[in-house]
C-alpha cells in the first residue's frame, strides 16, 4: 500500500516539477561556479 502511494506521489506533477527546477538550478549554479563569466559573455 505504501509503495503504491509513494510511487504514485513521486510521479505527480508538483513533485516532478520541483525536482526538475532543483536540478536545473543546480546545473546553472555549478556551471556559473566553474565558468563565472560565460553565462553573460557577449557573443562577439
Curated annotation (Swiss-Prot):
The chain crosses the membrane at residues 9-29. It is found in: Cellular thylakoid membrane. May help in the organization of the PsaE and PsaF subunits. Its main location: membrane. The keyword Glycoprotein does not apply. InterPro entries: PSI_PsaJ, PSI_PsaJ_sf. This is Photosystem I reaction center subunit IX. Keywords: Membrane, Photosynthesis, Photosystem I, Thylakoid, Transmembrane, Transmembrane helix. It comes from the Bacteria. Belongs to the PsaJ family. It is a single-pass membrane protein. GO terms for cellular component: photosystem I; plasma membrane-derived thylakoid membrane. The keyword Cytoplasm does not apply. Pfam families: PSI_PsaJ. GO terms for biological process: photosynthesis.
Amino acid at each position: 500500500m505504501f509503495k503504491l502511494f509513494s510511487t504514485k506521489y513521486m510521479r505527480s506533477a508538483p513533485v516532478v516539477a520541483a525536482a526538475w527546477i532543483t536540478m536545473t538550478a543546480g546545473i546553472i549554479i555549478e556551471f556559473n561556479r566553474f565558468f563565472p563569466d560565460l553565462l553573460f559573455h557577449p557573443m562577439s
